[in-house]
């Protein structure tokens, strides 16, 4: 899996950073999941390597405008492009009303169904939000001025590496049989021989895990959600020098994000959602924010619009 940042600014866009949005590209699939959709997100998608037609799920963290104002326009565009499969939208209660009223007020009728899932109960009861045979999604309550939720996407373990040479040495012909063996299934060949796929595969490969936490001040639930994750994307609205504002507005400092990564044993941290007050022309720059976080959690990176990063 990999992610592409479509917006990395907090509150309002700047000349170099749009407001919040991130695209997750699933492994061995053309499917894309979108996390937050601030104003101008569809323009950012057009400038990226993401195709809007690939978007199948949208996850919204909370109902502040810099995370949702791009939704009506994006959905309308998808409707014009002939998307007929439908989109699953996950988020707080109130999201359905916002989208439906926006579309109704602008006389926009979509050509595909929207399926809404309200996440409150899933977060409070620690229930799995989505699951199939390859992946599962969990969510957790964060600490912000309005209800906000973090999301974790976890791949299930993958089959071990298939030993082709062993299969060839046993004169097993290449083809669909190899696929079944790689999945650990028992197969019977045309000549009557029986093989157990587990004998041809190495140990299972651990699936990748990605966590997205914004907007929030430091939160123990974010630590729990991020436990042993491969990649944590966490908001860092403020420098540690502006910690008082972080507590006032219930946003995170660089140190809070780094502390979350450290306590959760996350492997890699990317900080995002930076206040526009930090520019290369000001006393505190984005590079300074990165250095602050790296003092606590060295394997930290700084998000920027259109940055693509592998989960592992």
Swiss-Prot record:
MF term (GO), any: 3'-tRNA processing endoribonuclease activity
The free-text note explaining how the cofactor binds reads: Binds 2 Zn(2+) ions.
| Positions contributing to Zn(2+) 2 binding | 66-67, 215, 273
Cofactor(s) needed, names only, are:
Zn(2+)
Instruction: Give the EC class as a word.
Output: hydrolase
* CDD domains membership: RNaseZ_ZiPD-like_MBL-fold
Tell me which UniProt keywords the record has, alphabetically.
Endonuclease, Hydrolase, Metal-binding, Nuclease, tRNA processing, Zinc
Q: Which residues of this UniProt protein bind Zn(2+) 1?
A: 62, 64, 144, 215
Under catalytic activity, the entry for this protein gives: Endonucleolytic cleavage of RNA, removing extra 3' nucleotides from tRNA precursor, generating 3' termini of tRNAs. A 3'-hydroxy group is left at the tRNA terminus and a 5'-phosphoryl group is left at the trailer molecule
| Endpoints of the signal sequence | none
Task: Identify which residues the record assigns to the active site.
Answer: 66
The domain of life is: Bacteria
Protein EC: 3.1.26.11
What's this chain's function? Zinc phosphodiesterase, which displays some tRNA 3'-processing endonuclease activity. Probably involved in tRNA maturation, by removing a 3'-trailer from precursor tRNA.
User: Which family is it part of?
Assistant: Belongs to the RNase Z family.
Question: Can you state the subunit structure given in the record?
Answer: Homodimer.
PANTHER family tied to this protein: ZINC PHOSPHODIESTERASE ELAC PROTEIN 1
Name of the protein: Ribonuclease Z
Recorded name of the encoding gene: rnz
